[in-house]
Amino acid sequence: MTAPTEERYVVTRTIPAPPAKIFAVLADPARHKHTEPGDWVRDAEDTDPITGTGQMFAVNMFLDRAGGHYVMHNVVTAFEPDRTIAWLPGQLDESGKHSPGGWWWRYDLTPNGTGTDVTLTYDWSETDQGFRDAVGVPVFGPEFIEESLAALERAVR
């Protein structure tokens, strides 16, 4: 895991499943609610599978300190089947343009014997200071990333 002073968390977990099975969960927005340990991520508004960079998918979310219910629009920034998937969360402005929040999620999958090493990176280094102060970024500690990978492992079974 990275040092807590960095503006990112990086955690790796070996999951006893092939990369394709893990990637199938990550590329399915409807299953994202099963990849986090709480009840923050809700149902996907866009349930089509993720197929490449530039694709946008929306997910319903809930966080008290962010005002309760909201929709997060994610733009896929990396997509290599069975290897890498990443997205940049944000909101849509009045014209429908994606406005990034300044944080991103990335999963890197590496075969390891009969399993897969899954590295999850959460980076908030580009998040505006005003938003950091208002919501408290990061809104969770590094243990949330570890618990997210455990949830992903359960979702893959």
Residue ranges and their predicted role:
Residues 13, 119-122:
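Short, hydrophobic/aromatic-enriched beta-strand segments in well-ordered soluble domains
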